[in-house]
């Protein structure tokens, strides 16, 4: 990873620690209607908070969390709910 990419990752991680920023980020990705992009965004939010800490707060094993949020992951709604709760967010539904 080059220095520019590292700075971007660090900047994104810092922004995603703010629940308002993280929620806006996830909402923007949801609007893309791309499940793979949503999985990546959820992984980025969890990474910003520290995967080990998110796993602990979500009462999930670290390997389970990494697998669920991996590129080929397919997390259950229960796992998504736990991860969101662990980072200070919640799932909600609004009219389309």
Question: Where does each model-flagged region fall?
Answer:
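N-terminal flexible/basic segments that precede or flank functional cores
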Residues: 1-44
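Short glycine-/small-residue-rich flexible loop motifs, especially phosphate/cofactor-binding loops
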Residues: 43, 52, 81
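Short, flexible active-site-proximal loops enriched in glycine and acidic residues
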Residues: 55-56, 94-96
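Residue-level detection of the helix-turn-helix DNA-binding "recognition helix"
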Residues: 70-71
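DNA major-groove recognition helix of helix-turn-helix/homeodomain DNA-binding modules
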Residues: 76-94
């Amino acid at each position: 990873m080059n220095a520019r990419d590292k700075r971007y990752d660090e900047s994104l991680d810092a922004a995603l620690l703010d629940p308002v920023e993280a929620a806006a980020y996830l909402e923007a990705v949801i609007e893309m209607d791309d499940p793979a992009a949503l999985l990546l965004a959820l992984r980025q939010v969890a990474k910003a908070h520290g995967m080990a800490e998110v796993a602990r707060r979500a009462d999930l094993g670290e390997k389970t969390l990494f697998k669920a949020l991996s590129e080929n992951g397919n997390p259950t709604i229960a796992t998504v709910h736990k991860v969101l709760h662990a980072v200070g967010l919640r799932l909600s539904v609004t009219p389309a």
